[in-house]
């Protein structure tokens, strides 16, 4: 990718994902997500799945149904990483719910065979993939989506030292490294996303 900010933004997001697994965050959610944009078959989905070591792959899913709101919220407590595959297929009717889910630090739900409602810890972070470039439809802003263009085929054959990778992430958290985005970083993300913004219908008609 040609995005000079990608390495830093992904690093912060990765630390936040790890922090959620270790229950270091109770008041805020990992409310941003990397959104990989590129042609079909370039290795986006495999790259997302490979972020988790084989021992944790059971906590990865690329199947979430936003029309079933209760199940979608409960997935936050059951999975470590949720990939919104084919992001542009998410109906605009569910965009506000998606934003709400991204920002949820806990899920209030009744456990099976329990009477009282409990606040369940959120473990899941989100990532997404898309084949099309005009994918952002919300005109109110896109600071939560770290859109990144895949300019070639991703090399997914490189072996990853997961033990070392996550040991470094945990060490960074213990040393107090920041795992949330500043307002300046969010502003930069919004500016970068302009190229991925879908034009309003009236503008599309005007340009025809």
Predicted regions and their residues:
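P-loop NTPase catalytic core of nucleic-acid-dependent motor ATPases
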Residues: 1-77
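Feature primarily recognizes SF3-like P-loop helicase cores of small DNA viruses
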Residues: 29-32, 58-61, 67-94, 100-102, ...
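Short amphipathic alpha-helical segments and helix-helix/interface helices
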Residues: 48, 98-99
